[in-house]
């Protein structure tokens, strides 16, 4: 059966999500999920009908939250579908390319490679910022540039002046996609205000992180209306199931937003607790994180990751040497993880 697959698919290495990697334990801090399991109400009376392509109540609710016009919002099956739509809509297979800056989220390359679009990489600088001269030198045939901020897995914010420089150099050349999956934890760092000046800017958002709805698979693309209309040409006819739209709209209600903001304060306190406890350990470096996770460098990251795994504490190994990414859980999970790591290192 493998030989019947397209050559690009045969050569493809699938993205190994936290769930695919697996593990067994009672502390799961490997997928940047929220520890809060919130309850929602759902009306089962409409399940015999297809959903609307872009449910107005959901679009209007997210537009109000993001402070944009409803015409500037597209909803999809997670931000991952937004990535795929952008590549499919703007890149010609076997002709165009995307560009991204590792270490960063792995689905940019997967989405491109799946449909035969070349991937170009320009690594981040030593302080995990954009290498603008190298990006500019690599823009030939590039139609989409992906930038993640806060970046996954490093946790840092990309300098705003560099984003502006990137937007200027890509005018009339490429779409710039800001992946803001974790921006709810630092909304003041969003680039949404730049949409008014840059028609080639697209912004990815999700309800998976701060809104504690990873299992719902509901994401958004923010852009100017002309770009959104291009994406609407290639999106599936019923991308957002009725239950997803209804629950997401509840999460974006006044009560839902108040709960989300309260829970983010709790997570911020737990992140500070975890960071402070790790920083005092010998040989440990904790990088500043703006999302719901921390990137931590150990004397031997692989051994810490494996020992925690064997102990039922599931963390996320990193492609960065000796680094482990730790999601911020509830206080009990953070205490258990910190205590285990302390015992390993002292």
From Swiss-Prot:
This protein's UniProt keywords: Amino-acid biosynthesis, Aminotransferase, Histidine biosynthesis, Pyridoxal phosphate, Transferase
GO biological process, any: L-histidine biosynthetic process
Protein name stated in the entry: Histidinol-phosphate aminotransferase
Top-tier EC class: transferase
Pathway assigned to this chain's UniProt record: Amino-acid biosynthesis; L-histidine biosynthesis; L-histidine from 5-phospho-alpha-D-ribose 1-diphosphate: step 7/9
HAMAP family, per the entry: HisC_aminotrans_2 (MF_01023)
Lineage start: Bacteria, Pseudomonadati, Pseudomonadota, Gammaproteobacteria, Vibrionales
EC number assigned by the record: 2.6.1.9
GO MF annotation, one: pyridoxal phosphate binding
N6-(pyridoxal phosphate)lysine: residues bearing it: 209
